[in-house]
Structure formats: C-alpha cells, structure tokens
Swiss-Prot record:
The gene is GEP5. Essential for respiratory growth and required for maintenance of mtDNA. Required for cell survival in the absence of prohibitins. Keywords: Mitochondrion. Belongs to the GEP5 family. Its main location: mitochondrion. GO terms for biological process: mitochondrial genome maintenance. It comes from Eremothecium gossypii (strain ATCC 10895 / CBS 109.51 / FGSC 9923 / NRRL Y-1056). This is Genetic interactor of prohibitin 5, mitochondrial.
Length: 266
C-alpha cells in the first residue's frame, strides 16, 4: 500500500475498527472492488479538501452499513433474481382507479402513501403480461411460494420505512408499486414504456433498501454500540452517532424490524 495513504487513514479521527477496514480495501489491487474503493476514496478526499465531519460520516456509513453488513436474504434474492421477480411485481393501472368506489381505502397508491399496513395483504404477486420476449418459454429459478415470500418481505421492510419518515435520507419516499399511467385517450401507456417502469422500479427499490437504507443485524448494532462507547473524544462519538441517525434493525429469525438503539443516543 502507498505509505502516504496509510499515514492519512491512520490519522483520521475514526475508531480503529473503521480505519482497519478502509486500509484493507485500499490495500487491494485497484482492479479489485472498484465500486467500494470509489465510495471510500470520494468521502476521504472530501474530508481532506474541505475538513468538517460530513466526509467522515459517509466513510463510517459506507464501512459499517455496507461493506461490513450482510444484507438480509430477501434482498440478496431480489438482487440475484431481479429480472424474474420484476415479472411478478405488483402494479396499479390509473384507469382502474375510475372503477373504485373509495379510492382512499382501495387504491394501492393511496394506501402506500398513507403508510397503511393493510396494503401488504392486498398486494398480488401474479405474472403480469408485460416484460415478455415473444413466444419464448419462461424459466424461473424460484417457485411461486419463494417469490411470494421474497416479495412480501421486501415490501414489509419498505412499509417499515414508509411509516417512519425520521429514518429517511430523502424528503419523500416513493411508493414501491408500479403505476401504469394513461394516454390522453384513456388507454394504458405503450407496453415498452410499462416495461421500463417495472425495470426502473425494481432497481430503485433494491437500491433504496440495499444501499441507501440498509437494515442492521442485531450483531452489527452491538458492534456499533461498542465502537461508540469506545470513542475517546466527543467529536469522534458525534461522527458515529450522526452516521447512525437513521439506523434500524432486522431480527432475521423473527422477521421483525425495529428502530435501532443507536438512535437513542441522539
């Protein structure tokens, strides 16, 4: 490793557990982990140029909420089988809303916007007629039961976040279902555009849950509590607390989400 980089990282006002991970990734060949290296180098450069703690907070988040954190199984399966699962992704046609007697209580969009958990029971994971490749037979890696379980857990995690704006890193959390708009004549928009909507929606949901708002494991939460308790200065402690200000936890055994104890320090 470049000794200059090693000196810089070793002098950062960060806990050794964080610095060791940064050094480990930066010491690998440049061709290895290119994305991870970029996401480490950019906030590091930001801190060196501007000072302040924002770059350090990004480093802490990237190390402990991404590099060191194993995603839950349902997100790993969504990532691996996204092209298959997007063929079963729930949607709502705008023209179908005209037939509803009570849009507020029956529309998927309105229920999601209002954070109503009952919408999870109304979601259907059936093969829709978009994203088809002519008459080519489709082969699936997952069974219907597996698909339903993965998608239910994905949307349960999304609902947990939707109900808690304090955990958002964005001003507005979009709804996770695909909305199929209408043409001026009242028909569905062209199929090619709908295909794009399904692809974009599954990518954005995966990115939001996997990268932008990852759920800690109970073990990862304990590690962060220990690190914060060991911080030698109040300034370092604040860096970690701010990086954890939107933390929440998934107990994989019970499949329950909860707001992290890390937020209680703030």
């Amino acid at each position: 490793m470049n000794e200059h980089i090693q000196r810089i990282v070793s002098r950062l006002p960060l806990h050794r557990a964080t610095s060791e991970v940064i050094l480990a990734y930066l010491s690998k060949q440049q061709a290895q982990y290119p994305t991870e290296r970029i996401e480490l180098v950019e906030p590091l450069n930001d801190f060196l140029r501007k000072g302040g703690h924002q770059g350090l907070q990004r480093l802490v988040f990237h190390v402990h909420f991404q590099l060191m954190l194993r995603a839950p199984e349902h997100l790993r399966l969504l990532r691996r089988h996204r092209e298959e699962l997007q063929r079963f992704w729930p949607y709502e046609r705008h023209h179908s809303l005209l037939a509803l007697s009570d849009v507020r209580s029956q529309s998927l969009r309105r229920l999601w916007e209002d954070g109503q958990e009952e919408v999870l029971q109304q979601m259907q994971y059936c093969r829709h007629h978009w994203l088809r490749e002519g008459d080519v037979p489709e082969r699936y890696a997952l069974t219907q039961a597996q698909r339903e379980e993965v998608l239910h857990r994905v949307f349960a995690q999304y609902m947990f976040l939707k109900q808690r704006p304090a955990l958002w890193s964005v001003r507005r959390l979009p709804i996770p279902v695909v909305e199929i708009g209408m043409t001026p004549l009242g028909f569905d928009i062209p199929d090619v555009r709908v295909d794009g909507l399904f692809k974009d929606k599954t990518k954005s949901v995966l990115r939001l849950l996997y990268r932008e708002h990852p759920a800690l494991t109970p073990a990862a939460e304990e590690d962060m509590l220990r690190i914060i308790a060991e911080c030698p200065t109040r300034a370092m402690r604040r860096i970690y607390l701010r990086a954890c200000r939107r933390a929440y936890v998934l107990d994989a055994d019970a499949q329950l989400f909860r707001v992290s104890r890390l937020r209680h320090f703030i």
